[in-house]
From Swiss-Prot:
Keywords: ANK repeat, Repeat. Residues 296-308 have a biased composition (Low complexity). Residues 101-112, 365-378 have a biased composition (Polar residues). Coiled coil: none annotated. ANK repeats lie at residues 506-535, 539-566. Residues 61-118, 276-314, 355-392 are annotated as: Disordered. Residues 78-92 have a biased composition (Basic and acidic residues). InterPro entries: Ankyrin_rpt, Ankyrin_rpt-contain_sf. This is Putative ankyrin repeat protein RF_0987. It comes from Rickettsia felis (strain ATCC VR-1525 / URRWXCal2).
Length: 566
């Protein structure tokens, strides 16, 4: 039994070692952590059952170590106890934030055998704690100076300092401890504190919101458009063209010969309603198909009222007749409108006769005659035109009286003066009479005021006072204005009378008269108005010759220039 138990324990140890080798992270830097709790304070409640199981087998393994150096084992055991307590404390406080404690002394690496044994024992415990911390994030220490190799004296001094620090520390709850201790400060060296990693976000290329429309779309886009296109409505197959049915005139039977088979009349088909499609059949039709004419009247069924004759047999259930209605239900736009004649209310019979005459003249075809004299046909009355209410009839009578009264008081929607006076009361009539009297009394003063306001209505500002003279006197006044150098008077006369080319009694023209007076402005004005330069006077002299004889160089140059244009 003992051998079996040993084998079982051996296999369990092998499994644990294999699991630790696969699950343990890479070895961390050697660091001595400071424990702020006593050995008795640390509770075993935070340690899981699996960790306790591993510790049990690890302790049993430590007991088998050969006691080669008893002093070294005691020292290692003394160093192992605070490290185990610190490992338990770090497992509970691993979630707390990192706090840098500054320059903390780290144990220097020595080449002595004592330190190597202690490191080996501590590394075994560190591997056990790393299994629980494998899932936690890796903390980068940063640019931390590693401890340098030193002598045994330096190591003993640092151990003594750490022991004094542990004794002086006070246990404070919820105070985080440094995870990594800093090396001792030496002359000429400094420690760089760890820096928090900065996350750099790279810009992402977002897709454009509006895609550019290509000039030449790809065939794939056309396929997409075709797939998105709306579904076309189902096309109805074309029915065979069939002419509309034609209603043939019925055969009228005499009442004296009773018939056993009733005659059926097809219903009336209005002109504006399309005929329903008729499915073709293999049976030939007995009636010929004729195209309907647009002037064919609409046939409607009517009731038959036979006369009560003793010699004729009455059978209303078997005889039906068709009559043409005189008044159509709907007005056709191709036919002329029927004029409405309004007469006095005491002549109703004449109105009915005139309307009936107009209706019979507008209808192109009449109803077919009935052979039997014993049958009377009742015409279908128009409900819209004939069946009127009492209020409509009264309104028509009132309108007739208003339109056809000889002494009408309404003209273009306004009451006449006589009707206004008749509807006035006494006070309004007296006030109106006083206004009219004042209007008549102020007629003279009103004329004076109007003449003062409109004093210039009969005066044409482009005319002169000589405009009212006769044509002959106008010519004399024109030459008189030239002699007096009156340019404005001459202009007013020329605007009214066509006297530009006229001559005076002495045979002079207006241009020669202006040259004799040496009036350059009058001569230029006449040339601009279009007077003839080549006209001779009674002495057979041209205007240019007179200007040269008078020695007026300005008029001569003006005439020479103007002669080239005439």
């Amino acid at each position: 039994m003992l051998n079996k138990l040993c084998k079982i324990l051996f296999f369990i140890n092998l499994l644990l070692v294999a699991v630790q080798s696969y699950a343990s992270p890479p070895p961390s830097l050697p660091a001595a952590e400071i424990d702020t709790k006593d050995k008795d304070v640390s509770s075993n409640s935070d340690i899981s059952f699996f960790d306790k199981f591993k510790q049990f087998f690890s302790k049993s393994k430590k007991k088998n170590i050969s006691p080669k150096q008893p002093n070294e084992q005691t020292k290692a055991a003394n160093q192992e106890e605070p490290k185990l307590a610190s490992q338990e404390h770090t497992e509970a406080d691993a979630s707390e934030p990192f706090i840098d404690t500054g320059n903390t002394a780290l144990p220097s690496v020595t080449a002595s055998n004592e330190h190597e044994n202690s490191v080996n024992l501590a590394s075994h415990d560190i591997q056990e704690s790393n299994e629980t911390e494998a899932s936690k994030p890796f903390i980068d220490v940063g640019n931390t100076a590693l401890p340098s190799a030193a002598s045994n004296d330096v190591h003993t001094n640092t151990e003594h300092e750490n022991s004094t620090n542990l004794a002086s520390n006070i246990i404070t709850p919820n105070v985080p401890r440094p995870i990594v201790s800093m090396p001792p400060a030496q002359a000429g060296s400094y420690v760089v504190p760890p820096q928090r990693p900065v996350q750099i976000y790279k810009p992402t290329n977002l897709p454009p919101v509006h895609k550019p429309i290509p000039l030449n779309p790809s065939p794939e886009a056309n396929k997409e458009e075709e797939s998105v296109a709306p579904i076309a409505p189902q096309s109805i197959p074309n029915m065979p063209a069939v002419s509309p049915p034609v209603v043939s005139p019925p055969v009228i039977q005499d009442t004296t010969t009773p018939s056993t088979m009733p005659t059926t009349v097809p219903p009336a088909v209005p002109s504006n309603v399309p005929a329903p499609p008729v499915m073709p059949t293999n049976q030939p039709s007995t009636q010929p198909i004729t195209p309907p004419s647009p002037n064919t009247p609409v046939t409607t069924p009517s009731k038959v009222v036979p006369t009560t004759d003793s010699s004729a047999e009455i059978n209303n259930s078997q005889e039906t007749f068709v009559a043409v209605s005189d008044v159509p239900k709907k007005q056709d736009w191709n036919t002329p409108l029927i004029p409405v004649v309004v007469v006095k209310p005491n002549q109703p019979q004449a109105l009915e006769k005139q309307v009936n005459n107009n209706q019979t003249t507008n209808n192109q075809e009449k109803s077919p005659p009935v052979s039997s004299s014993n049958v009377t046909i009742q015409k279908q009355d128009d409900k819209v035109n004939n069946e009127t209410s009492e209020s409509t009839t009264k309104f028509v009578k009132d309108e007739t009286q208003m339109l056809l009264l000889p002494d009408d008081d309404i003209v273009l929607g306004k009451l006449t003066e006589q009707a206004t006076l008749e509807q006035m009361d006494m006070y309004a009539y007296i006030e109106l009479f006083q206004k009219k009297e004042e209007w008549i009394a102020s007629a003279k003063r009103r004329k004076v005021v109007e003449s003062f306001i409109k004093y210039d209505n009969d005066i044409n500002k482009k005319k002169d006072i000589y405009a009212n003279l006769s044509y002959c006197k106008a010519v004399d006044n024109a030459f008189r204005a030239v002699d007096r150098n009156n340019l404005f008077g001459l202009r007013a006369l020329l605007d009214v009378y066509p006297i530009l080319q006229e001559k005076s009694r002495s045979g002079e023209t207006l241009l020669t008269a202006a040259i004799y007076n040496d009036n350059y402005y009058l001569a230029k004005f006449l040339v601009i108005r279009g007077i003839k330069i080549s006209t001779l006077n009674d002495e057979c002299q041209y205007p240019l010759d007179i200007a040269l004889a008078q020695g007026n160089a300005n008029i001569a140059c003006m005439l020479i220039k103007a002669k080239g244009y005439q």
